[in-house]
Regions:
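A short, Lys/Arg-enriched amphipathic alpha-helix followed by its capping loop at the start of a domain
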Residues: 23-33
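Glycine- and acidic-residue-enriched helix-capping/strand-helix junction motifs
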Residues: 11-21
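Glycine-rich beta-strand-to-loop/alpha-helix junction loops that act as flexible
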Residues: 10, 62-64, 87-89
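Short beta-strand segments enriched in small/hydrophobic residues
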Residues: 2-10
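N-terminal small/polar loop signature for handling phosphorylated ligands or for N-terminal nucleophile
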Residues: 36-81
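Short amphipathic alpha-helical segments
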Residues: 18-20, 71-75, 97-99
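Gly/Ser/Thr-rich beta-alpha loop segments that engage phosphate groups in nucleotides
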Residues: 15, 65-68, 90-92, 102
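Catalytic core of DAGKc-family lipid kinases
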Residues: 5, 31, 38-39, 53, ...
């Protein structure tokens, strides 16, 4: 069984993740992925600390573009080189749209569970 950090913004979009949490957990468990759940908060030091755990196989971010970007930035800053799955559950979800991740949560979860990956360029803007 694989283990993933599931980092979500409970306020993004129409608050889909908190309402669908049981179904999300079930879909990942059906694919032998155990989720360690973390909510985005004012102090995210526990999330960043958890990213360094040796028993973590992947990181999953669920939220809008801000949440997806914040998690990616933490990973880059901390030198975390794990697969990063994204569930676009925010208002616009431009990032997930641009890399062809479906809006349908079950389809997006399926892509993550199957290990499909995309290379994405990152940069720094001042």
């Amino acid at each position: 069984m694989k283990r993933a950090l599931f980092i979500y913004n409970p306020l993004s979009g129409n608050r889909l993740v908190p309402r669908e949490l049981d179904r999300i957990i079930e879909k990942f468990q059906e694919n032998d992925i155990f989720l360690d759940m973390y909510r985005i908060a004012e102090d995210n030091s526990k999330i960043i600390e958890a990213m360094h755990r040796k028993d973590i196989d992947m990181i999953i971010g669920a939220g809008g573009d801000g949440t997806i970007g914040n998690v990616a930035n933490w990973m880059i800053k901390e030198g975390i080189k794990l697969p990063y799955g994204t569930l676009g559950t925010g208002t616009c979800n431009n990032f997930t749209h641009n890399i062809d991740i479906p809006e349908d949560m079950e389809k997006a979860i399926h892509i993550i569970c199957q290990g499909h990956s995309y290379n994405v360029d990152v940069g720094i803007v001042n």
